[in-house]
Amino acid sequence: VDYAHKPEALATVLDTLRAATSGRLVLVFGCGGDRDRGKRPLMAEVVERLADGVLVTDDNPRTEDPSVIFDDIRAGFSNVDNVTFVAGRGQAIAQLIAGASADDVIVLAGKGHEDYQEINGERHAFSDLVEADHALTAWEVAHA
């Protein structure tokens, strides 16, 4: 779980983890709403270059339509065939972890320590750590 929400920070995280990965390097990420739209396609370029798999999802859409954010991110990928767009960050985390192998490294980027998701001007309780814990428990049961 990392707060990386800028292209440079995301590249640093992925480069660092790549060196320690024997399996795939996969991640969930999104871009915040009502913020710099120009970095959205740049984030996609970094992910496409450095990750083996990606689920794009919500990351504090605030008052912006999440589909517009997805479109901006989609524009940065040269090929979206291996990119999955999932509305609902909890669902994206669960889906990515459920499909992971034991030697994969999973990155949940963008929210870090935050314990909320800001949607339509309201903060809703949400934690990547809590969602990952639930998904990892389910993964362990499925792979026991």
Per-range role (PLM):
Residues 1-144:
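ATP-dependent carboxylate-amine ligase
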